[in-house]
């Protein structure tokens, strides 16, 4: 029977891994159990069979077979499999475990608290492990440091280094703690396929196929303002979505006053002490989407068609969006792919954009919608490669502060421009954009992001300095050396 065998196998391997059981004595039993788990319990389609029904004791007169399945049996199998990896790799730390020293050096005049990258394969080889989270990272005070393994084979570490200084981290075999997620996101199918993501600074969202199918014209990135470092998206969406049904009942019962009061209490369009959505996107770039250009017109691919989440915290969130084909000039099936990456501790997302089926070079832009409430509150800096804007939010009279938005172009720009709209759309009167040349087959890389005056960005001058400093730091990354 699978669940019992798996639990015993896990326990015996755990005992060997932690030096409580003699491997020579228990290895034959462990191998017998594991052989059953992989040759009999594991089915060709990946399911786990031969699991007794929940709540029942073993009964030799009753038979289980490959179709006898239950979630707890699968969980027990996976528990044993994880311990099996540590058993084979010997990855539980002991005094004889090899260690790796990692020096992180800051040659700049800025205090740095960056997410840095190493090749995960190199770490696995040096520790003699097959892969996975089978090691622990410590700082100089023997405090565990959170890390993340990415979809593209990187090991991410967060390093805090003073100006013109260095710090040393130590990597050893062992079982890491479960880290608190700060950079994460998901698709909210219950809210018309929103892709929403956040870190300890702010949150954003992109609109999906359900919005496009409904006929709503919302193209750009939206902003979730936060004034707490902990994840808030689940709270935002749960509070907003669960209130809809209750409001409906109150409205139909003629209890409009109670309905309005409930809305004010639960909606994420009001600040209840941890943040709010008070940004209008509409048929614009919103807070930083890209678009190919035809003359002074932007060619939007509208909402994403498909999305794949690549990395899910705790230090980095990344996702790849693909869009429906659009016509650009004579090219009828131009498909945009957009990869966004957000690390812990930063206000800015990395955005890598590529266009398939484009036959000739085009101008490409990324920028920010300028709203009529603050039509002149933008800054364009071609030399340092960014545009920025202070947005008064949906209801300026509510005095909920300002949203500071920016697009940063570390690879340089052809121009920075204010492009007025032919007519006002959703309160927007124009865009402030950075424009580059795009060659077929290239990747257009820029950064977009935002901050809130009710959290950690007091004014536009500080926001500009933040963006400029980030640009400097991109050009001078922390130096990482293995010892």
List the predicted regions and their residue ranges.
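Solvent-exposed beta-strand/loop surfaces of large extracellular or lumenal domains
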Residues: 130-155, 327-329, 372-388, 409-422
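Polysaccharide-binding surfaces and accessory modules of carbohydrate-active proteins
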Residues: 98-109, 360-419
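Short, hydrophobic/aromatic-enriched beta-strand segments in well-ordered soluble domains
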Residues: 167-177, 319-323, 442-454
